[in-house]
């Protein structure tokens, strides 16, 4: 099956101002995607791909309003025949309510809330206890809510509070290190070092592995464990070689590699320029991006034992680090310490592992190697 992931930003407007937002330097461009352009996007995605992952992103995508998503699903459903669609939305949660949740669940759509931890931990997103209470309320009513958080210097020593919250309310969680761009570009109050990151992982990892009630995805620990013990790269963007199977489309139809902060030299044209979205991968700027990424991957493959797991890392991180052709030091240092740490932990403590999510993952993907665990 031919697969593509599309991050669709129907608006870049936002109703809050997160202090470290990687879009802060774009000043939250005003404008909203028309339903006509949305239909054009869906048609041009459907031409060449039969396995489509579509994530509504932003800005804050729920600012588009309920009626937009009713029409959006009508359009998507017209193109679902003989194709596999995975649809989600990444929202700050302020406007998420039961009405939206019902619409999303009816259409097989998952919602993920940007959330940096309960109580005061989440004040970095300017949404305080309001969002914590909303998550608790929606989960109590049976709605599936995933969480996406950002690790900064302000919360890295308190990840256990975040972990316990997700366990208590049954939310899958992914934590990303803060991006060195936008509001956090030069702010040492937010940026963390790889040493900080590794120390936090090492502290929480044994607790997570031995927790028999932790039946939920908890990234980055889930992905690092998947890679270390199954010896394959994890199915998340920065480790799966996203070129050429990942695009971001803004509200005006502009196309970039992904929704992160990319300079104009990597602009890939406009959806209006193409009859088929796959043509964006023929753009000269994409060829330059691919050329630089190949140089980086060749370097990594020749010099690192972990290339098969990280695939040379994230293009955007290398660009922000100053050179697309070289790996970003943060993730490299993390990999070289965390992967052997997990392998050693398993060798010495596998009898203590009680985490049902981990045990099921190993049995499911371990080709029989872990069936007796």
Stretch-by-stretch model annotation:
Residues 123-243, 248-252, 260-270:
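Radical SAM enzyme [4Fe-4S]-AdoMet core and its adjacent flexible, acidic
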Residues 1-36:
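Canonical Radical SAM [4Fe-4S] cluster-binding loop centered on the CxxxCxxC motif
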Residues 17, 21, 169, 240-243, ...:
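General secretory precursor processing signal
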Residues 262-373:
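Flexible mid-to-C-terminal extensions adjoining Fe-S/redox cofactors in radical SAM and related proteins
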Residues 39-55, 64-182, 187-192:
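Radical SAM/AdoMet-radical enzyme domain recognition
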Residues 10-17, 60, 243, 299-303, ...:
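Cysteine-centered iron-sulfur cluster-binding motifs in ferredoxin-type domains/subunits
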């Amino acid at each position: 099956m031919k697969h593509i992931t599309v991050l669709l930003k129907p608006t870049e407007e936002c109703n809050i101002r997160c202090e470290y937002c990687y879009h802060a330097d774009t000043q939250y461009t005003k404008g909203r995607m028309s339903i006509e352009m949305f239909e054009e996007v869906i048609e041009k995605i459907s031409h060449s791909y039969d396995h489509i992952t579509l994530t509504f992103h932003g800005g804050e995508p729920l600012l588009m309003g309920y009626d937009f998503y009713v029409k959006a699903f009508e359009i998507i459903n017209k193109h679902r025949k003989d194709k596999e669609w995975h649809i989600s939305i990444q929202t700050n949660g302020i406007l998420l309510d039961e009405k939206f949740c019902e619409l999303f669940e009816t259409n097989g759509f998952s919602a993920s809330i940007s959330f940096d931890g309960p109580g005061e931990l989440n004040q970095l997103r300017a949404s305080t206890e309001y969002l914590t209470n909303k998550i608790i309320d929606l989960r109590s009513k049976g709605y599936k809510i995933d969480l996406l958080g950002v690790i900064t210097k302000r919360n890295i020593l308190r990840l256990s509070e975040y972990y316990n919250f997700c366990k208590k309310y049954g939310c899958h969680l992914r934590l990303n290190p803060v991006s060195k761009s936008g509001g956090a570009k030069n702010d040492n109050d937010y940026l963390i070092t790889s040493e900080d990151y590794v120390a936090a992982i090492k502290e929480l990892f044994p607790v997570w592995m031995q927790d028999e009630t932790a039946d939920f995805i908890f990234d980055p620990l889930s992905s690092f464990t998947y890679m270390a013990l199954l010896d394959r790269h994890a199915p998340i963007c920065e480790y799966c070689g996203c070129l050429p199977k990942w695009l971001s489309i803004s509200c005006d139809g502009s196309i970039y590699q992904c929704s992160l902060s990319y300079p104009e030299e990597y602009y890939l044209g406009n959806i209006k320029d193409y009859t088929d979205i796959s043509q964006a991968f023929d753009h000269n700027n994409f060829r330059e991006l691919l050329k630089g990424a190949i140089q980086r991957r060749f370097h990594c493959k020749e010099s690192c034992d972990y290339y098969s797991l990280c695939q040379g890392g994230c293009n955007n991180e290398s660009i922000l680090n100053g050179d697309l052709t070289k790996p970003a030091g943060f993730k490299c240092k993390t990999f070289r310490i965390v992967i052997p740490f997990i392998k050693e932990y398993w060798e010495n403590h596998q009898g203590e592992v009680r985490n049902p999510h981990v045990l099921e993952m190993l049995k499911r993907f371990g080709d029989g190697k872990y069936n007796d665990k």
